[in-house]
């Protein structure tokens, strides 16, 4: 019953809204239309911000925290990078290539480049409309909070809760439960391949260790400060080393990505829609731009200008997809296709790592995925704080209850089928994006006005 409901909503969001009469027919979903519209609108209105103001984005990350409360710019980037790098760059890229082929990688790049401007706008708004957090200290915010402000403006009075804000918060909690399932599903599969450990045993150990960390009130940020930089650098160094070792093969891989991206073969077979759809879906799941996840961390930063936090999160999108996602994609695509035929999920990635590094590769990717998964789980629970508070008020019982639900979803995910687990995450992130866009479209001018003011002040300095 529940699986059927998830699949029905999934088809509504990601199924074909209409068919373009090209080749065998190209299916375009509602979510692709929505993201494409935002991807065209926001970069043009920010005048290609990632290109023009890249140096400012770097400078914003390096700024020190302005006060004692809240997080630094670097800490918010670490939290958002934890969820992006954790599942998006490993499991997300694997899913895109498994379902959409090499061409899906190109559409992930496009989603990131267009999404950086979207991330700037949503994170700037989150910083502008943040609120004090009486439970954890510091600040909290995100789309639920600026959706609430928008609803109060339209109604002309103070509201206890807004329907659209509550729907976003609920969608976020659903999505993050889905991500919890993806975590345990992928880790248990990787450990079964690497160490022949039964999925149930891996899942129970993973859940127990996660419980020790997350049931402590303020352990999340401290844990991520240590874990994320170390593991991201290690993974990046090893994957770049593999790519450089296989440099002569890289032109052929790039040719395959671009050839399949534009459907020169796929359009004839009617498969271009699958390439585009999987690239966009996994790109959104990876970099989170427009979904409203990262603004939940952006709101918590101590920052003297909301625009700077927009810069930080826009940079995070580029780091995630253009740099690290590409490394994972190249790892798989540098392997001869006949060796990975018929493989999907972590089986595909581990086979690729075995090809490059021998038996050590299987162990390396299993351990790396486990560490990344912890960072992702901690990151999404940090995102959930403000949304749980919006729905249930400021109390510890609701915060603890959601953490327990997420831990239960870890257990369930380890036992579920690969596709069912991804469907729940896709449903949640799709709904989040829809409700977030309901605020971004009418409120984007506020972020753009702040950007113009920032650039005017910069010229006077």
Feature-to-residue mapping (PLM):
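Membrane-interface loop-to-helix entry segments
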Residues: 34, 38, 42-45, 49-58, ...
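Transmembrane helix-loop junctions in multi-pass membrane proteins
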Residues: 45-50, 89-93, 176-188, 211-223, ...
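N-terminal alpha-helical transmembrane segments of multi-pass membrane transport
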Residues: 1-87, 97-104, 115, 439-461
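Selective recognition of specific alpha-helical transmembrane segments in multi-pass small-molecule
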Residues: 114-122, 202-217, 228-248, 281-284, ...
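Alpha-helical membrane segments and immediately flanking helix-loop junctions
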Residues: 67-99, 125-128, 135-150, 163, ...
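Extracellular/periplasmic helix-exit of transmembrane alpha-helices
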Residues: 122-134, 240-256, 270, 300-301, ...
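Helix-loop-helix module between adjacent transmembrane segments
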Residues: 38-43, 114-139, 148-185, 189-213, ...
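Flexible loop linkers connecting adjacent transmembrane helices
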Residues: 48-72, 95, 101-102, 117-159, ...
